[in-house]
């Protein structure tokens, strides 16, 4: 949101914006990078790629959430979109049990943080932000901000 001031302002100023914003932020910046690894039980072809039986496969959750067949303009953050059906926190029997808590925390924390610090901004260029190297769970090493 700090890179999109117009959308940050909407979340800060419009109580109805937070619900769709949470879903869009989860879709756009998926925290968990892959689904539970699976082993193919039969030969299968996916998008023209042959995968033999017995191979370990990983499903990329961010790739699914950025699929243009799933959402229009997938690389554009649009907090009004809402992005229902994203895979950011699993799906079906593999949906995270903590999902309702995570959504509630974001529903409370984002508006409160943005009201308390209305001038919240990045303190360094976004390209200088350091990311964690562990690739299963996505995140920042740190985030310098000003207010």
Label the model's feature ranges.
Residues 1-147:
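Cytochrome P450
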């Amino acid at each position: 949101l700090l890179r999109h001031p117009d959308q940050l302002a909407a979340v800060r100023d419009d109580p109805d914006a937070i619900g769709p914003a949470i879903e869009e932020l989860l879709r756009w910046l998926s925290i968990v990078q892959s689904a539970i690894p699976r082993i193919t039980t039969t030969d299968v072809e996916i998008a023209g790629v042959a995968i033999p039986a017995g191979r370990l496969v990983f499903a990329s959750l961010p790739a699914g959430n950025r699929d243009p067949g799933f959402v229009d303009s997938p690389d554009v953050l649009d907090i009004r979109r809402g992005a229902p059906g994203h895979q950011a926190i699993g799906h079906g029997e593999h949906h995270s049990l903590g999902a309702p808590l995570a959504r509630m925390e974001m529903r409370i924390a984002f508006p409160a943080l943005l009201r308390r610090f209305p001038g919240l901004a990045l303190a360094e260029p976004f390209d200088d932000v350091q990311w964690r190297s562990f690739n299963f769970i996505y995140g920042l090493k740190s985030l310098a901000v000003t207010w």
